[in-house]
Amino acid sequence: MALSIGIVGLPNVGKSTLFNALTKAQNAQAANYPFCTIEPNKATVPVPDRRIDALVDLVHPQKTINATVDFIDIAGLVRGASKGEGLGNQFLGNIRECAAILEVVRCFEDDDITHVDGSVDPLRDIETIETELLLADIQGTSKRHERMVKMSKGDKDARVAADEMARLLEHLNNGNPASTFEAKDCPAFAAAWHELGLLTAKKIIYCANVDEDSL
């Protein structure tokens, strides 16, 4: 199964341009207006590996299959996405399917390219996205905790899992990402954690989109 990486960021920061560059394709429309991308663009890219190349030279197999990465170009996120603003739930659902997040951040000035918040501020943009991911995790965890509490009556293991979910919810409410939560050994909680697909538990790679003079 290929590793899936979701390309995310605010509208008009260069996500689709990066997607086209990574996949050597022009499948994703890149335009100077918000929500140019609505449905996610997807492409599978083979991963170069010199070790495989060396083995191919030695063995001369009939067929060579490299590891692959699935890149997914996801619609732009805006402040309030966790409450349904912009493409809201659709955007967050698309991210949930990815194993890792590639966050594109605009770091260049250009009066001809609009910024959804009116000015270029990379740190503010990162905070906006990570806040929305955290709020979405809080919502999902809160709902799951409520269900687990109802199911825990008379079931010791379920009660332990519900208590652990409460600890996770407190952790998130304190502004901490799920990736820093230290869970106790509890199979029922581990299963619930996996089903939640917490956004702040995913690895994040930051991509700074700079002007040519900064390269």
Spans of model-derived segments:
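C-terminal-of-GTPase-core extension/linker across diverse P-loop GTPases
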Residues: A2-V8, V13, F19, R147-L215
